[in-house]
Amino acid sequence: MTLPARTEVVVVGGGVMGTSIAFHLAEAGVEVLLLERDALGSGSTSRAAGGVRAQFSDELNIAIALRSLEAFDRFHDRPGCEIDLHKTGYLFLLDREEDVRVFERSVALQNEHGVPSRLVDPAEAKRLSPLAGVDGVIAATFCPIDGHASPESVVLGYAAGARSHGAVVEPGCGLTGSRSTAERSARC
């Protein structure tokens, strides 16, 4: 393995976050080197269930989630990989009145930002997810644009996309140290 002598950005970690950063920077014309000490996607991404959702309780996370869902919808075109995206919806089951009040406010905020979430009763929750146990459930929230995708496919798609834009992606190469120089660059 021969690493470049110079690069503009070093991304450490080859999971969903690192490969996404590498892809977007490389696509924007930035010289990128991505280092992953093990296999791509072998860290926390390897333990992710792949859930994707827009049901959050604050404006920032709702906005980020909506952008992510849009990106996942177009992933087969950009960066160009199938990620096994299924918009099956996401159901939160609630069994405490105080949680229902919190989720009612969250649903109102989500709706203000274009998220089609809604509060449902236990019978509709059971209809939406027949295997869900609804004993003790007093309400639920559901959003049909939520779902799941393959985290491994997302990682591999972003890594391939980053490479296609000139990034150097090096699995099996961990960062063991760095130091800053007067030019505000790092030496590894």
Residue locations for each model-derived region?
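Short loop/edge segments at beta-strand edges and connector loops
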Residues: 36, 121-122, 171-173
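Gly/Ala-rich phosphate-binding loop of Rossmann-like dinucleotide-binding domains
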Residues: 22, 26, 161
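Conserved dinucleotide-binding and phosphotransfer motif residues
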Residues: 28, 113, 164-165
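Helical element adjacent to the flavin cofactor pocket in flavoenzyme catalytic cores
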Residues: 141-188
